[in-house]
């Protein structure tokens, strides 16, 4: 539902500022490791809100020039302890808020829904001479994200559980071609109840 269809502006207006610091140093040999820190802030001056929490049976689209921002902090670490062995780790924290309208005419500032609060990743890669074989393994941890309330009552909001993901890949170089074999989601993580009220698709609680 778009209450003010004629005045609805589909274009968002925002300003992003930030910076990065990088330091190279040695753990085993000179210059074998790099540490970097990034910070970026996006300040929204006109947001397009797809509000799932205005009411229990509608998604309301509207513009908002009220407080809305995203702060992102990220730390990256890369290390080559021995030749052809690369280790990479990263951690990202996200603080994201927006202001939504309420049916009583007031506003509420809430954490932006479905945005993970943090994410961390570890990747280890080893290559044989001339990179004929490359072995790659990745572990990832996804932090909780706020789930929009389905009742219209902001006190009912919940958070998704944090969950890990694991990936592995082997590649073989044959002439000008690369042959890949790999597996994603090795631990077979599955989301519980991905569809709410799946057995009753015409109810107001279906999502």
Predicted segments, located by residue:
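Short coil turns and loop connectors of transmembrane beta-barrels in diderm outer membranes
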Residues: 27-31, 45, 83, 129-132, ...
């Amino acid at each position: 539902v778009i209450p003010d269809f004629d005045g609805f502006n589909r274009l968002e207006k925002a300003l992003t500022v930030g910076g990065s610091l990088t330091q190279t140093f040695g753990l085993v040999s000179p210059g074998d490791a790099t540490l970097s820190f990034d910070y970026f802030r996006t300040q929204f001056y006109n947001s397009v809100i797809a509000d799932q929490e205005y009411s229990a049976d509608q998604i309301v689209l509207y513009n908002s020039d009220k407080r809305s921002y995203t702060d992102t902090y990220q730390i990256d670490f890369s290390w080559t302890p021995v030749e052809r062995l690369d280790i990479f780790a990263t951690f990202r924290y996200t603080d994201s808020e927006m202001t939504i309208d309420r049916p009583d005419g007031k506003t509420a500032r809430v954490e932006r829904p479905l945005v993970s609060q943090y994410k961390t990743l570890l990747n280890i890669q080893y290559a044989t001479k001339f990179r004929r074989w490359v072995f790659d393994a990745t572990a990832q941890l996804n932090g909780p994200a706020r789930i929009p309330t389905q009742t219209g009552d902001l006190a009912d909001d919940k958070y998704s559980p944090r969950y890990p993901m694991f990936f592995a890949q082997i590649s073989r170089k044959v002439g000008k071609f690369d042959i890949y074999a790999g597996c994603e989601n090795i631990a077979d993580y599955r989301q519980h109840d991905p569809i709410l009220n799946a057995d009753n698709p015409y109810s107001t609680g279906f999502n």
